[in-house]
Amino acid sequence: MQFKNALTATAILSASALAGTNSTTSIPSSCSIGTSATATAQADLDKISGCSTIVGNLTITGDLGSAALASIQEIDGSLTIFNSSSLSSFSADSIKKITGDLNMQELIILTSASFGSLQEVDSINMVTLPAISTFSTDLQNANNIIVSDTTLESVEGFSTLKKVNVFNINNNRYLNSFQSSLESVSDSLQFSSNGDNTTLAFDNLVWANNITLRDVNSISFGSLQTVNASLGFINNTLPSLNLTQLSKVGQSLSIVSNDELSKAAFSNLTTVGGGFIIANNTQLKVIDGFNKVQTVGGAIEVTGNFSTLDLSSLKSVRGGANFDSSSSNFSCNALKKLQSNGAIQGDSFVCKNGATSTSVKLSSTSTESSKSSATSSASSSGDASNAQASVSASASSSSSSSKKSKGAAPELVPATSFMGVVAAVAVALL
């Protein structure tokens, strides 16, 4: 084994401190590998096979056909398996705890990785594993999970996790389903650019800080009550959204470019703390699932081909408002009444249907109502037409996968005031 630091007593103590070990028994010197060590052959791993605990960061790389860590139950440090072009399988079924990270990256023929007893790890990073089909753990505690650019068909190794900081699954083209026991996500939940018909179930999830879903076919959030920051559904093939337990979104709520979405039910949602955007959902003709929303802390934009928009409980919008339907059956009457009562507190109010247009520049008292035409502007000042600028929600990923996005959201148009708020919402989701 090629040690990067000599096994002096000082190095051993330093490695133990860095790993934060709480062992009450001394670790044999042969099991303390210094700050880090690299194994390039199974023979290197066999030298520590008699250890129940190793102290330090272990890297496995080089021309190994298969590799195994026998007997080791704990790594007080990180385990990295990296850039091994011939490694086809790896097993470490005795390991229960890794105090640092488990990193598996750039393993082009690795088909299986087994950590059958692993219950606790700080982070798991699985990136660029183009041949892997199985990954197993007994994971109970982890802070961060990133799975990107793999051929996994399922991620059952994470199915029993209750809490995480980050859960990011992207660009796994064969991944078609995932059922999670997560109850809270303290930073972000992101799912994007996976299989064509991906179905997700997060029915135990009660609280999350941020959620962004892209390229998903079906989603279930049976218990979700609060999203502390932003919630976005972008470029999905979802036929419906049912978040009937959700009562609050602390910042932005975006439902953008979901071409097959025909129903959105948010029947207990009362508060959106930032921008509220429903845009370019071509099959969403009746929008009646937001009838309990009372306050919107930013701008509101609803655009599409809808004939019904029920915001009957809305009392306050602290930004501007843009309602634009291509359907001549949509009526602006209720929204104009909302504006005349002073509920719209931003700098502009625009409401259009297929036949008429009403726009108000709220920094002045001018109001214009006119029949729409193919060439006429919605507002003589031009501010209202700027309010139709679309929201940017282009799909993004953290990997080098060549998979193309299933759809592209409109381009972000820089603007001030009302649209500045809308743009900020979109940028926050990227």
UniProtKB/Swiss-Prot annotation:
Membrane topology: Lipid-anchor; GPI-anchor
Record GO cellular component, one term: extracellular region
SUPFAM superfamilies cross-referenced by the UniProt entry: L domain-like
UniProt keyword list: Cell membrane, Cell wall, Cell wall biogenesis/degradation, Glycoprotein, GPI-anchor, Lipoprotein, Membrane, Phosphoprotein, Secreted, Signal
Main location, first listed in the record: membrane
Region (Disordered): 362-411
Compositional bias of kind Low complexity: 362-402
Lipid attachment points (GPI-anchor amidated glycine): G407
Entry PTM: The GPI-anchor is attached to the protein in the endoplasmic reticulum and serves to target the protein to the cell surface. There, the glucosamine-inositol phospholipid moiety is cleaved off and the GPI-modified mannoprotein is covalently attached via its lipidless GPI glycan remnant to the 1,6-beta-glucan of the outer cell wall layer.
Annotated glycan sites: N22, N57, N83, N197, N210, N228, N235, N242, N268, N280, N305, N329
Example GO BP: cell wall organization
Signal sequence extent: 1-19
Transmembrane segments: none
Residue ranges of the propeptide: 408-430
Record bears the keyword Nuclease: no
Residues modified to Phosphoserine: S340
Role played: Required for proper cell wall integrity and for the correct assembly of the mannoprotein outer layer of the cell wall. Important for apical bud growth.
Family: Belongs to the SPS2 family.
Protein's name in the database: Cell wall protein ECM33
